[in-house]
Regions:
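Iron-sulfur-associated redox domains of electron-transfer enzymes in respiratory
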Residues: 1-233, 237
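Ferredoxin-type iron-sulfur electron-transfer modules in oxidoreductases and energy-metabolism complexes
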Residues: 215-238, 255-358
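Detector for Asparagine
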Residues: 14, 75, 245-248, 266, ...
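A general structural signal for well-ordered secondary-structure junctions
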Residues: 32-33, 111, 246, 309, ...
Length: 358
């Protein structure tokens, strides 16, 4: 069940300032002990996550930033993992990041009882390097990341405790849509006004979802046609320098001990020479194609199509384009959608005797 609350814009505020005030009230009133939020760098050159426990440190907060800082879900893991202080955290995350957190909860990486997930409706984001331009140019004129242009889930969905709604909301408000008792309690504790969910909300969300589904379907078809026989796959990966940025920023790549840091993928000087002797010639860095194939197999059922992998790639490998051709197809085989529900087991974590593949 959804509960709606009105967070009114005050004194000439825009929605960004109103969302910042919401975080301020959450800390001031003790609704949570800490807030994880996107913070603008000095001069507005970029945006990164910050974890604040005092209201005076919220001045740089940009909860509705049109860019995705890296490591949001990973920071939430660190803030709630066993051994840390028992502090309740309100985390402002994009819808794709919320879906990643849902997957991490299933993998016992995040303690959900200590987190209130706040997720702004997302109209799409630009690359971090372009963030400064959002201050000087029309946001609609800036190119959105491909992952955002084909996003099928632009709202927080079931995984979010509270959506910071702009879709279907009045121009003078943020519509706080709570989906959990924890989210409802948060909205009440900050003094938001309870209202009915307006019919414009469902209509606006449905339009955004339909547009995303259509864009994703078109990209999926194009990607499958391009990569179906593998002919374009290896050339597309030819510029890989195996920096592992894609792996390091991936929100669902959670293993503490990783195959890619073993001798199989990260050979020592001696084993590198042995491989060169056996093969006669050896491309270095080694096993770049195998690296991507292994990563793809490892994360595909949990992938939320956030696009962080492509954004972090220094050589511009079209990873979102590649994943778009296989991500939904693999998940559909298991009747699964990553990040849809915390109660939905991941495909490879349970056994069904009567399992059928779609």
């Amino acid at each position: 069940m959804e509960y709606a609350f009105r967070w009114e814009l005050k004194g000439g505020e825009n929605r960004q300032a109103a969302a910042r005030r919401l975080l301020h009230e959450a800390l001031r009133r003790g609704a949570v002990g800490a807030v994880l939020f996107p913070a603008e760098a000095r001069g507005g050159a970029g945006v990164a996550y910050a974890l604040a426990t005092r209201v005076e440190h919220l001045g740089s907060a940009v909860p509705l930033a049109r860019a995705v800082p890296q490591f949001g879900p990973q920071n939430l893991v660190r803030a709630t993992e066993p051994g840390g202080g028992p502090i309740a955290v309100a985390a402002v995350l994009k819808p794709c990041e919320v879906r990643a957190v849902v997957e991490l909860v299933k993998l016992k990486q995040v303690a959900p009882s200590r987190v209130v997930l706040l997720s702004p409706d997302c109209p799409g984001t630009v690359e971090l390097k372009d963030y400064a331009r959002t201050r000087d140019e029309s946001e609609d004129a800036l190119p959105l990341r491909l992952a955002c242009r084909i996003c099928r889930r632009p709202v927080g969905g079931e995984g979010a405790d509270v959506s910071l709604g702009t879709l279907g909301a009045r121009h003078d408000e943020l519509l706080l849509v709570a989906r959990t008792d924890r989210g409802r309690a948060f909205c009440e504790s900050v003094g938001a006004q309870a209202v009915e969910v307006p019919p414009t909300r469902a209509e606006a969300v449905a339009r955004a979802v339909a547009a995303g589904e259509a864009a994703h379907a078109a990209q999926e078809a194009a990607s499958r046609e391009r990569y179906a026989k593998g002919g374009a796959f290896v050339p597309a990966l030819s510029t890989c320098i195996k920096c592992m940025n894609c792996m390091n920023v991936c929100p669902v790549c959670y293993c503490k001990e990783c195959l890619f840091y073993t001798d199989a993928f990260n050979p020592t000087a001696g084993s590198l020479a042995d491989k060169a002797k056996r093969r006669g010639v050896l491309r270095v860095p080694t096993e770049t194609v195998q690296f991507h194939l292994t990563r793809m197999a490892h994360v595909m059922t949990a992938c939320v199509m956030c696009g962080q992998c492509e954004s972090a790639c220094p050589t511009g490998i079209p990873l979102v384009e590649m994943y778009a051709g296989i991500n939904k197809r693999i998940q559909d085989l298991f009747g699964y959608e990553s990040g849809r529900s915390v109660d939905e087991p991941q495909p490879f974590t349970e056994f069904r005797e009567d399992e059928e593949f779609g």
